[in-house]
């Protein structure tokens, strides 16, 4: 499989080609975000871009320095050009390595090129509700033929089709909504609402987690995508309206210790985002939250953060 990079280079050997991207056939690629990401790198320099596994066990078994082919990785034109004359010898040198993506990492390392990790690329060696997606554009999701459907009322193919509905409007904000009423540092430690790909001893994951709690002030309320529309009836602006509904009844005990009212009455969340501009990669957006006590709907309006606004 790694040799196919050389074949592609020979067929398309011209300066109009900037990147060579490898991924598995069970990987979902968000092309708009991928193109924007590649535009932040100089393809005339040596770049090897990808991610490792979310699972410590997988990385320890294979490599912590490898861009996993399932998640997808990209090689700049300059790097492939440098590899082209050496690729046959490199494959022979590393023929004992079982995985083609491991060979790719090894050959790149022989040129002194290390993996540049991008957090929006997902190997998905976990299964469950990924509430730890970073504030980076969503580039890829792997293992869609094996992981649990991301929408509990749908099968895998239905889940993919449902996810692509908001992707048609705006990929830059996809998978970026997560509301937590905790101190900002604690909110970076997601509760493990997912499980590792394979059974192993902890620690399991390559990111910060905290134990699930029965405390009603800490238990998550989960809402799933229901619909998305573009509307020009909201004032003078065109907006994308994304609706989320509660996945199960809010039957948790009322949380009173932190002085906040219970979220149990809320059954729907409407998110209003600009339809004319993509979210800037690597930047957070701020929001205004409108909720009337006793109602079952919360309105969230996204906008660029004003000077001085920050997570607190």
Predicted regions and their residues:
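Secretory-pathway lumenal glyco-enzymes, predominantly type II signal-anchor Golgi glycosyltransferases
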Residues: 1-312
């Amino acid at each position: 499989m790694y040799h196919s990079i050389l074949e592609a280079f020979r067929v398309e050997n011209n300066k109009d080609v900037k990147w060579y991207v490898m991924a598995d056939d069970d990987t979902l690629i968000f092309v708009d975000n991928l193109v924007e990401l590649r535009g932040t790198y100089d393809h005339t320099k040596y770049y090897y871009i990808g991610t490792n596994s979310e699972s410590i066990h997988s990385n320890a078994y294979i490599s912590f320095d490898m861009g996993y082919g399932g998640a997808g990785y990209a090689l700049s034109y300059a790097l492939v050009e440098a590899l082209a004359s050496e690729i046959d010898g490199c494959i022979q040198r590393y023929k004992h390595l079982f995985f083609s993506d491991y060979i790719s990492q090894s050959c790149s390392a022989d040129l002194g090129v290390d993996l540049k990790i991008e957090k929006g690329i997902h190997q998905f060696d976990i299964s469950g509700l990924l509430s730890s997606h970073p504030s980076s554009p969503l580039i890829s999701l792997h293992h869609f033929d094996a992981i649990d459907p991301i929408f509990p009322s749908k099968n895998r193919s239905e889940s993919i089709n449902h996810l692509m509905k908001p992707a048609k409007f705006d990929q830059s904000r996809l998978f970026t909504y997560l509301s937590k009423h905790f101190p900002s540092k604690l909110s970076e430690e997601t509760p493990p609402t997912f499980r590792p790909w394979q059974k192993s001893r902890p620690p399991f994951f390559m990111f910060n987690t905290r134990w699930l709690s029965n405390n009603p002030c800490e238990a998550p309320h989960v809402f799933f995508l229901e619909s998305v529309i573009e509307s020009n009836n909201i004032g003078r602006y065109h907006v994308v309206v994304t609706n989320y509904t509660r996945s199960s009844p809010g039957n948790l005990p009322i949380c009173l210790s932190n002085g906040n009212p219970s979220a149990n009455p809320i059954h729907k969340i409407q998110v209003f985002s600009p339809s004319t501009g993509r979210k800037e990669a690597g930047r957070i957006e701020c929001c205004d939250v409108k909720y009337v006590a006793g109602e079952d709907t919360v309105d969230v309006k996204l906008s660029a953060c004003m000077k001085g606004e920050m997570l607190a």
